[in-house]
Amino acid sequence: MVANIQAYLENLQQPWGQIYYDILFEQLQDIKGKRLLDFGSGFGLVANHLAKDNEVLAVEPNEEMVALRAQDHPYQQFVGSLDQLASLEDASFDVILCHNVLEYVEDRKVILRELTRLLKPGGLLSIVKHNEVGRVLQTVVFENDPQKALDLLAGQDLETHSMGLAQAYDLGAAVEDLALEIQDYQGIRVFYGLQDNRFKGQEGWRESMLQMERAVCQESPYRDMAFFQHYRLKRS
């Protein structure tokens, strides 16, 4: 399946797309005064938001997404992928973001090795990834498709509605031989992905659901059943 960029953009503009960024931005609010790389920056929503208080370089291979990117705050944008990273100096970033990228690539290890090279000692690598438990829960509860959920449990990749196949992976295994240490993780989309979309347009839904997600995002077992998990890793 080829990425459907317009469908992806329309989904982000819905209440259930907007609340994802409400939660993520809160989890990133301590990042200020840093030199930051956003690898796989998409429509530039995170790069643009963080550019208010940071020096940001965004890298994205999809030209259509780059053309539609948010630009309320100044930041540098490269079009490309690993090819754009090769010319960057070692240990040149305080913070690197890689959000919902590694599910869609074959060269996951190569990317992680390159991001580690670019990160300063003590620097932060922020990774948002799919959580297999959360994917199965949403498939059974929201989509009402137990057979698809059984296929996911058997190792089948998830067919996303707009970005193609997403492959589950073990982050601990992916970074075990790199100079990266997992510090903590938080959940995103613990509850709201399980709810029928007809509720999500109701007045006050976004605010009340944000309060609920905020209350449990750092707590197990809730963060362990979230659709997305946001990991913070430190460069040793």
Where are the model-predicted features located?
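A short SAM/SAH-binding and catalytic strip from SAM-dependent methyltransferases
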Residues: V95-D107
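Conserved class I S-adenosyl-L-methionine
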Residues: M1-K32, L45-H49, M65-L68, S126-L152, D196
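Class I SAM-dependent methyltransferase SAM/SAH-binding core
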Residues: F43-Q84
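A C-terminal cap/extension of S-adenosyl-L-methionine-dependent methyltransferases
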Residues: D184-S236
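A short acidic, Gly/Pro-enriched loop at the edge of an enzyme's catalytic core
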Residues: A86-V95
